[in-house]
Amino acid sequence: MSKPIVATTSLAGCFGCHMSLLDIDERILDLIELVDFNKSPIDDIKNFTQQCDIGLIEGGCCLDENVHVLEDFRKHCKILVSVGECAIMGGLPAMRNGIPIRECLEEAYLKGPTVRNSNEEKIMPNDEELPIMLDRVYPCHEVVKIDYFLPGCPPRADLIWNALVALVKNEEMDLPYEVFKFD
């Protein structure tokens, strides 16, 4: 019997959720026995090579490129899981949502204390190669259908492990309080 296929990606986030996944420590060897990875920074596969059973999404959508990646994951994954606060609610990147995008860019490139004296030409990046910023940061479920949510910033490794094993084995998730609590 073939192993379930898992894909992962990081959108507008810090990669902390992937680090938490790697924090399952030696259980990563057990995970490799349970699943194969496809399109993931974990195995450096950059494009889907087949349909996947489970997709783990970290980060929200703040660029048009994030939306395209998320839609591609929805198309290629039977089950899609939002992992972490950025994917679920927009997280820290969503702090810009109450500020018009132009003001955010001006603060970052023209007025901020770290750039005020270093950008005397008042240049703001504007190149067709750069991804287009969205008007706000969108949580994943506002863009595509999400099947499961794993909260935390980042979620604990035990939470990710328990949820992933339950999904792979087609079992009900047993997620006791301890896997949500972070000391």
Predicted ranges, named:
Residues M1-D183:
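Iron-sulfur-associated redox domains of electron-transfer enzymes in respiratory
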